[in-house]
């Protein structure tokens, strides 16, 4: 998923992504990716990961556990995700945070599996700390703006620049921004400030017209 910019859609456990509705989201995302020439990744609810793996999309898990293959009932194991066609995972999302030690273990583990790591952080200090492990992406998301409809690029624009500076020494790590992103204007501002892509959730999945929302964000990246 090295091509920039990238749009990651986190479906969380929203009912709007349940059942057959994930198929509509995946089709809309694949269509927008082809039309606008941007990379789009979808992170469906964990039990629906297999439902979208056949689409022309990058599929990410919303969370992984630092557990091994074998007798680890209920845990999400990176190796098995890779065997199932999943391309990578979000790590340390604000709704499912893990320890710094787990990040330090999981990022190189995904790298060894040729899988994508997207490490979520709440501020530039955490970005600096966790970028030392050289994940593919650091996603800056102030928790107070997540799901608020108030975008980080308009409410906290300085944070994007600070985070970009914080990860500058992490070779190969790209910055994403999330929290409150709902419009093409939000996307364009974030890219101007140094972000290489967007992590979005409710702004797409809970939109009255998810396909139109995806198209607007993708077009702003093209």
Swiss-Prot record:
Subcellular location: Cytoplasm
Keyword Isomerase among UniProt keywords: yes
EC number(s) reported in the record: 5.3.1.1
Classification via PROSITE patterns: TIM_2 (PS51440)
Keywords carried by this UniProt record: Cytoplasm, Gluconeogenesis, Glycolysis, Isomerase
GO BP of this protein: gluconeogenesis; glycolytic process
Reactions catalysed, as given in the entry: D-glyceraldehyde 3-phosphate = dihydroxyacetone phosphate
MF GO annotations: triose-phosphate isomerase activity
Binding residues for substrate: 10-12, 146, 180, 201-202
Pathway recorded for this protein: Carbohydrate biosynthesis; gluconeogenesis; Carbohydrate degradation; glycolysis; D-glyceraldehyde 3-phosphate from glycerone phosphate: step 1/1
Enzyme type, top EC level: isomerase
Entry annotation: catalytic residues: 93, 141
This protein's record includes keyword Cytoplasm: yes
Subunit structure, interactors included: Homotetramer; dimer of dimers.
Function: Involved in the gluconeogenesis. Catalyzes stereospecifically the conversion of dihydroxyacetone phosphate (DHAP) to D-glyceraldehyde-3-phosphate (G3P).
Family to which the UniProt record says this protein belongs: Belongs to the triosephosphate isomerase family.
Entry protein name: Triosephosphate isomerase
Gene that specifies this protein: tpiA
């Amino acid at each position: 998923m090295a091509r920039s910019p990238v749009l990651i859609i986190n479906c969380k456990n929203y009912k709007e992504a349940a059942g057959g509705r994930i198929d509509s989201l995946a089709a809309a995302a694949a269509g927008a990716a082809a039309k606008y020439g941007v990379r789009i990744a979808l992170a469906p609810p964990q039990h629906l990961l297999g439902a979208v793996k056949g689409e022309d999309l990058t599929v990410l898990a919303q969370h992984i556990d630092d557990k091994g293959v074998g007798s680890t009932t209920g845990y999400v194991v990176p190796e098995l995700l890779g065997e199932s066609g999943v391309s990578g995972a979000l790590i340390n999302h604000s709704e499912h945070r893990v320890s710094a030690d787990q990040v330090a273990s999981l990022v190189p583990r995904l790298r060894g599996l040729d899988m994508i790591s997207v490490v979520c952080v709440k501020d530039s200090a955490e970005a600096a700390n966790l970028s030392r492990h050289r994940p593919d992406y650091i996603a800056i998301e102030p928790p107070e703006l997540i799901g608020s409809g108030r975008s980080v690029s308009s409410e906290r624009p300085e944070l994007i620049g600070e985070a970009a500076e914080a990860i500058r020494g992490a070779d190969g790590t790209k910055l994403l921004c999330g929290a409150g992103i709902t419009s093409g204007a939000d996307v364009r501002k974030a890219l101007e400030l140094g972000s290489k892509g967007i992590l979005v959730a409710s702004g797409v999945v809970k939109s009255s017209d998810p396909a139109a929302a995806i198209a607007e964000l993708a077009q702003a990246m093209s």
